[in-house]
UniProtKB/Swiss-Prot annotation:
Its EC number is 5.3.1.12. Gene3D superfamilies: Metal-dependent hydrolases (3.20.20.140), uronate isomerase, domain 2, chain A (1.10.2020.10). Pathway: Carbohydrate metabolism; pentose and glucuronate interconversion. InterPro entries: Metal_Hydrolase (IPR032466), Uronate_isomerase (IPR003766). This is Uronate isomerase. Belongs to the metallo-dependent hydrolases superfamily. Uronate isomerase family. PANTHER family: URONATE ISOMERASE (PTHR30068:SF4). Keywords: Isomerase. The keyword Calcium does not apply. It comes from the Bacteria. It holds the Pfam family UxaC. One of its GO terms (biological process) is D-glucuronate catabolic process. It catalyses: D-glucuronate = D-fructuronate; aldehydo-D-galacturonate = keto-D-tagaturonate.
């Protein structure tokens, strides 16, 4: 019987073990999309305790705790840090079968070195004390953990109005070699249907010194901010397309839509689609001219629990998977961006695994001459960021495209302890390829398949994003 979380965890064949230990394990981490707070990296934040680094802001854990009957006070409320950690420790034994159980113990093992002990009510105090003692050391600050985990690059998620001063601080510090670069997340600039849109336009106008009245004014304001981001090393954009919309409109129509919204009018769904299409097509061309990568995260159904949304706000664990069709609108959007050969490198992620084959085939429609893997089907996202979800995403990518050109894993996390997700991904990748070899579906060519694993683990992303390390 295999031991839980051994050095050969998930590696169920000799070939898989060789792939992982000889080609994957020592590869650095290129974490091209995350939600780490850049100010904590800039100030080399020292975490107060295990709750501060591990549970604070983690909606994955909060969902599990709520499902286990834990009161909200112990999730997001005013309970002490220890009480919240104790409640999490009591929940962990009930998460067997959920990726949280694997993640929890991988994160305790690296970087804390906790092995042979499972988190539970009986071990909570010992683990709390041991890890808190380590968090007082210099190698367990925000930067220290990144260095321990062999991180080479992180891409944070940043709003166009951000001043990016924390990125500048990191970039100017010659003692810290890890690249910390902003990613452009302009959702607030095109979600015209939201009640917050007009206030955001005022803020965008202020930071860009632009009076936004017409669509061309919005373009001018965003261009200034794109230049600002580019000056700070940005090479990546990210868009939450909860619902993919497409409806064309001329400039006069876009001017009218924007003016009426700024005057307080409510727009029709068709007008919202026209405006979003206009912004996305224009931004796509800007990304292409600048050599940026655009990412589309598709299919989240957000803020489902209205009562909790009013109490706690967004992004606290009340989101789920949408089932709106996306193929036709996405095809038209990408085709429109491609009309003048201004479709940038693009990564498509779907939250509904039903859409895996849709994206897996969609990327084949728009690949670029002389650019391997220009269009990417992104790694299993959010609810698919687990063993089965990763296996399905990679299997379908292999069947419908070229797995060997895949840019691999990203944490998409707010936690400095989530880097073990790269380890988890690499183990699953090696397990999958090892099984192909065992079944005679792939040659037992270690150099060939080892190079493929090495590329997916790090080199493909480094080359795709064209960021000098």
């Amino acid at each position: 019987m295999p031991q839980f979380l051994s050095e050969d965890f998930l590696l169920d064949s000799e070939f898989a073990r060789r792939l992982y230990h000889e080609y994957a394990v020592d590869q650095p981490i290129f974490d091209y999309h995350c939600h780490l707070p850049p100010e904590q990296i800039a100030e080399n934040y020292r975490f107060k305790n295990l709750y501060d680094i591990w549970l604070k802001g983690d909606h994955y854990k909060w969902r599990a705790m709520r499902t286990n009957g834990v009161p909200e006070r112990l999730c997001t409320g005013d309970a002490s840090d220890w009480e919240k950690f104790e409640a999490w420790a009591a929940t962990v034994p009930h998460t067997i079968g959920n990726p949280l159980y694997h993640w929890t113990h991988l994160e305790l093992r690296r970087p804390f070195g906790v092995t042979g002990t499972l988190l539970s009510p009986s071990t909570a105090k010992d683990i709390w004390d041991r890890c808190n003692a380590m968090l007082e050391r210099d190698d367990f600050t925000a930067r220290g953990i990144m260095q321990q985990m062999n991180v080479k690059m992180v891409g944070t998620t940043d709003d166009p109005i951000d001043d990016l001063r924390h990125h500048k601080t990191v970039a100017q510090d010659s003692s810290f070699s890890i690249k910390v670069l902003p990613s452009w997340r302009p959702d607030k600039a095109f979600n015209i249907e939201l009640a917050t849109f007009n206030d955001y336009m005022a803020k965008l106008g202020e930071v860009s010194d632009t009076d936004i009245r017409r669509f061309s004014d919005l373009q001018a304001a965003l261009t200034k901010r794109l230049d600002h981001f580019a000056a700070h090393g940005c090479k990546v954009s990210d868009h939450a397309l909860d619902v993919v919309m497409f409806a064309e409109a001329d400039d006069a129509t876009l001017d009218s839509i924007l003016a009426r919204r700024l005057s307080g009018e409510t727009l029709s769904e068709h007008e919202v689609a026209q405006f979003k299409t206009g912004v996305l097509v224009w931004l796509g061309a800007e990304y292409a001219r600048r050599g940026w990568v655009q990412q589309y995260h598709i299919g989240a159904l957000r803020n489902n629990n209205l009562r909790q949304f009013k109490l706690l706000g967004p992004d606290v664990g009340f989101d789920s998977i949408n089932d709106r069709p996306l193929a036709q609108e996405l095809s038209r959007l990408l085709s429109k961006q491609n009309e003048e050969n201004l479709l940038p490198k693009t990564i498509l992620y779907c939250l509904n695994p039903r859409d895996n084959e849709v994206l897996g085939t969609m990327i084949g429609n728009f690949q670029g001459e002389g650019m391997p893997g220009k269009m990417q089907f992104g790694s299993g996202w959010w609810f698919n960021d687990q063993k089965d979800g990763m296996q399905r995403q990679m299997t379908q990518l292999a069947q419908l495209g070229l797995l060997s050109r895949f840019v691999g894993m990203l944490t998409d996390s707010r936690s400095f302890l989530s880097y073990t997700r790269h380890e988890y991904f690499r183990r699953i990748l090696c397990q999958m390829i090892g099984r192909w070899v065992e079944d005679g579906e792939a040659p037992a060519d270690l150099p060939l398949l080892g190079e493929m694993v090495k590329n997916i683990s790090f080199d493909n992303a480094k080359n795709y994003f064209a960021i000098e390390l």
